[in-house]
């Protein structure tokens, strides 16, 4: 059963209903549910499907491709010696298929592009020279290495330039979708617990699938993150390595951003890392934004060139705050931290990030979903005449109204007293 993803399913269905061949690129961070979405949408039925081999060399990739062709029904398929031959074999198989629409699903496509394999040129030839000239091919590519798909396919300046006909940048679940997912698994969670779980795991479906019935939220987090063999105990390194060819530079940037709650300007990032030029930094920041690890925003009174980059990936932030600091390898770290000052300080900041990830839902709750608006944050450094202040969410509406939003994480409804009201008015 697919939770949410209605718009994404519609895109996939429309590709099949099209009168022309379609080239669909699906990308997004590791564990966000890309493969599951595609397989469930098509009922696990494809004319041809293949998954690249993690760390396989060219010979192994080609052998695996031939095995997939045999599994699809090409019984006497030979082992190709090159990718040109491999895609020629695929074309021959598809020509003989009786499927009205021939759905070709190539999963983990970036893994197939091994050094000196000439994969890209053969892939270009398959689409440009054959598939795009027909009306019955639906080519769906997918992969966690988002930077590869963006640079080598979507933003390619060579043979694949403007060839992708439909894109799906698969996003994490919203809080509502996580609630639906938890209910589908039979997990009994209050909305307070759902919010805290989201603050730790974000909206990554795979992470939520690891939660077990019968355990408290704290016990679940201990088991999957802090236990010696926890399923997510080493997720941080695997996450960035799966997405980026040279993950170290991306980790450098998110590490710097992780130290500044409100985010940093480009100049501040360059100063903090002391190793990146503007050009190199632009590429890394763009790819981190594509993958949903950071967001780029403008302060309410700032110009575009002073845009601020903020780390928003919940798991990464949780890693920096707690997992990386768990030097004693305490397997019950989270259970022992409940109601501690450290936990309370973290939860307030994490709840602010949760709200910032749901500005569309906040606008809907305020009844202004249909009003054109921009979302900003505002901060003022302390000086000799006044204290510093910060407003995390400003909704600047086209109807000449500005909504000022303060986020407070509380077990019960938060009551604004006279002192706090005056504090807000001073801002």
What is each stretch, according to the model?
Residues 1-337:
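Phosphate-binding site recognition
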């Amino acid at each position: 059963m697919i939770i949410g993803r209605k718009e994404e399913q519609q895109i996939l269905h429309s590709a099949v209903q099209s009168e022309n061949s379609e080239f669909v690129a699906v990308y997004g961070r590791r564990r966000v549910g890309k493969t599951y979405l595609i397989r469930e949408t098509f009922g696990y039925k494809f004319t041809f499907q293949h998954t690249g081999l993690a760390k396989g060399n060219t010979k192994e990739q080609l052998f695996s491709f031939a095995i997939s062709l045999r599994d699809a029904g090409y019984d006497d398929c030979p082992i190709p010696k090159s990718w040109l031959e491999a895609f020629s074999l695929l074309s021959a198989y598809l020509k003989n298929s009786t499927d009205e629409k021939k759905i070709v699903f190539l999963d983990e496509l970036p893994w197939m592009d091994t050094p000196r394999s000439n994969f890209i040129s053969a892939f270009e030839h398959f689409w440009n020279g054959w598939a795009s000239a027909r009306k019955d091919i639906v080519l769906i590519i997918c992969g966690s290495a988002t930077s590869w798909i963006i640079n080598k396919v979507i933003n390619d300046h060579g043979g694949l330039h403007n060839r992708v006909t439909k894109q799906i940048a698969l996003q994490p679940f919203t809080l509502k979708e996580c609630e639906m997912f938890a209910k589908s698994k039979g997990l009994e969670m209050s909305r307070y617990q759902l919010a805290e779980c989201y603050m730790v795991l974000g909206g990554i479906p795979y992470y939520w699938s690891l939660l077990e019935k019968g355990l408290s939220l704290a016990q679940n987090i201990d088991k999957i993150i802090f236990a010696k063999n926890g399923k997510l105990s080493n997720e941080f390194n695997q996450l960035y390595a799966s997405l980026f060819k040279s993950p170290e530079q991306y980790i450098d940037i998110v590490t710097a951003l992780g130290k500044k709650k409100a985010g940093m300007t480009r100049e501040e990032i360059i100063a903090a890392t002391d190793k990146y030029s503007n050009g190199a930094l632009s590429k890394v920041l763009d790819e981190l934004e594509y993958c949903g690890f950071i967001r780029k925003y403008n302060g309410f009174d700032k110009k575009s060139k002073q845009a601020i980059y903020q780390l928003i990936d919940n798991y990464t932030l949780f890693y920096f705050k707690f997992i990386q600091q768990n030097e004693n390898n305490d397997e019950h770290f989270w259970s022992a931290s409940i109601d501690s000052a450290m936990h309370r300080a973290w939860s307030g900041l994490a709840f602010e990030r949760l709200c910032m990830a749901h500005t569309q839902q906040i606008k809907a709750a305020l009844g202004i979903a249909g009003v054109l608006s921009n979302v900003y944050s505002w901060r003022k450094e302390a000086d000799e005449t006044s204290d510093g202040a910060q407003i995390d969410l400003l909704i600047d509406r086209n109807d000449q109204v500005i909504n000022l939003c303060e986020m407070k994480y509380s077990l019960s409804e938060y009551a604004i007293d006279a002192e706090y009201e005056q504090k807000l008015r001073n801002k």
